[in-house]
Amino acid sequence: MAAPATRSRYLLRLTVTLGPRSRSYHAPPPPRRRPAPHWPDRENLMTPRWQLTPRYAAKQFGRHGAISGVPPASLWPSSEQLCELEAEEREWYPSLATMQESLRVQQQAAEARRQAREQHIAECMAKMPQMIENWRKQKRERWEKIQADKERRARLQAEAQEQLGYHVDPRSARFQELLQDLDKQQRKRLKEERQRQKKEARIAAMASAEGQDSAEAQDSAASGKPSS
């Protein structure tokens, strides 16, 4: 029984000893408001900028009222500021009529774009058969040109082999040089043939024009004779 009693007395002494120490902390009192408005020194460079603005003066008036010395008329926006606020309000908060008009314009523009796109598609679809025909014609002409070039190349190679002999390698420099010469000669002959055909066509056109002029002259002369 002695041990529990001793332990109880020790705990009581510990409680009595630690009690005052646990209550030694005292929180600081809440900050008091200034009884009068605080106006910063404008000449002091350490004064915060926000304390020199009209917003700070409005805050002092709202906190202290008339004793702040701020005229209530200065709290209202000026004419210029009011115009800026109205313009900003019209820009960011337009009226219902303005929004409806803007929506109508957007819908008209979208409808115009849709109609233009549909018209463009219709025009393209109308041109599609002719475009397909032109594409097929161009493809056929390219194929014919390739085949003609192959045949011309084969004829030139055959002619070169006839001149040099079939024992000459077609990949040799001598064979390729002769092939180039034959190609140049053939191109020259084709060019001369085209020029001759153009010249003959021009002469035929001039002769036809002269014959037509003479026929018109004879007709006019015959119509000018007096009838018997």
Curated annotation (Swiss-Prot):
Gene3D superfamilies: Growth arrest and DNA-damage-inducible proteins-interacting protein 1. InterPro entries: Ribosomal_mL64 (IPR018472), Ribosomal_mL64_sf (IPR043035). Residues 212-228 have a biased composition (Low complexity). The keyword Manganese does not apply. Pfam families: CR6_interact. Residues 20-44, 186-228 are annotated as: Disordered. A motif (Nuclear localization signal) lies at residues 184-200. Residues 186-202 have a biased composition (Basic and acidic residues). Belongs to the mitochondrion-specific ribosomal protein mL64 family. This is Large ribosomal subunit protein mL64.
